[in-house]
Amino acid sequence: MPSNSGDDNVLQVLIKNFDVLALPLVTLVYPLYASVKAIETRSLPEDEQWLTYWVLYALISLFELTFSKPLEWFPIWPYMKLFGICWLVLPQFNGAEHIYKHFIRPFYRDPQRATTKIWYVPHKKFNFFPKRDDDDILTAAEKYMEQHGTEAFERMIVKKDSYERGRSSRGINNHMIFDDDYRY
């Protein structure tokens, strides 16, 4: 069956303008429907979800109005907004509740404390791989000697050494294939 060039053109227009077509559906149509449904069912969690969504939608709209010129330089912005609003809207993710509880509500409850948290800069340099003292064998040995004394540490080493010698003399071989003295 030959393809109709008119159908191809319509499909191309739909694909090119996906964000323009999907954004109103995701940001307005579905939330309006779900909000009315939540009002009619008188479900408090659903009411909170959609009230929270509308607060966040208003903040996003204010952000867009304020920064419209710089946002024009980011062609990916409409797609980021679409995915972000999908995260806010879809009940599987419950994004609106998360954003509200962790960002909006603390600011509303205590603005002074919330702004302090936002502008807090740690004084220490962040280390991606912090050294844990528990994993360091030398630190563990030093702690053991501080708690039990050097004589107890030496006794422990001698005891372990004699235990290993006893195992090898009885024919119990505990070698691994990557040990230097392993015999094939």
Swiss-Prot record:
List the disulfide bonds in this chain.
none
Give Gene Ontology CC terms: membrane; plasmodesma
- According to its UniProt record, where is this protein located? Membrane
Recorded topology in the membrane: Multi-pass membrane protein
- Residue ranges crossing the lipid bilayer per the database entry: 13-33, 51-71, 73-93
Q: Which UniProt keywords apply?
A: Membrane, Transmembrane, Transmembrane helix
Q: Which GO terms describe its biological process?
A: hyperosmotic salinity response; response to abscisic acid; response to water deprivation
| Family annotation (InterPro entries) | TB2_DP1_HVA22
* Superkingdom classification of source: Eukaryota
On tissue specificity, the annotation reads:
Predominantly expressed in flower buds and stem.
Pfam families reported for this sequence: TB2_DP1_HVA22
Provide the family line.
Belongs to the DP1 family.
Name of this protein: HVA22-like protein c
What is the organism field in this record? Arabidopsis thaliana
